[in-house]
Amino acid sequence: MDKTTIYIFKLVSVCLVFVTSISAGGSKKKEETIALKKQIYGLHKVDEETSSIPYLERYLELSQNELYFKLLYAKALLYRNDLSVPKPDEPAEDRINKAKIIQKNYNLASKLFQENVLHLEKVRPRDPNLGRWYYLWAFSEWFSDNKEKSIKLFLKAVKLDYRLTESYYNIASLYESLGQWKDASLYWRKFEKAEKELEEED
């Protein structure tokens, strides 16, 4: 063998090892994402959103552009129940720190909903679950104390899906908390009417 042939042989061997290594890595990643998906779906099926959070975070590390799983992550943050709630008998500093952690969680949920619900609406404007995602986004804004924005999102949710009649109930509650009694009364009536229409339809 001349030097050129030996060099080419070595180069091909190195390339084959490199390609095999990449292929093995890709296969391992695929196996992990499949296992994570199964775990996430299983937990959400039994309303264990909080337990799904670490699996969702790992899944999104591996697949950063997965729109649906970003929405599931936002939902899990909205529903999470493992954060310590401030108690009246605790020191003020502890209560403040706990409140900040809770607020940070809801702020992240609302940020994720905003980015991904709007993207979903852009790429799949007729998605049957779009109204439901707007509904959850509205709650995250409510819990982030963005009440006016929450009202607009609840209105959008029920416009997209008329079955989300509780949107009217939530809007009425929000208007009451803002001291806008006339608007609250209007939406209480809308809620009652929408509920009655749903019952008649069933």
Enumerate the predicted regions with their spans.
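N-terminal leader/linker segments that initiate helical-solenoid repeat arrays
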Residues: 22-63, 68, 72, 82-91
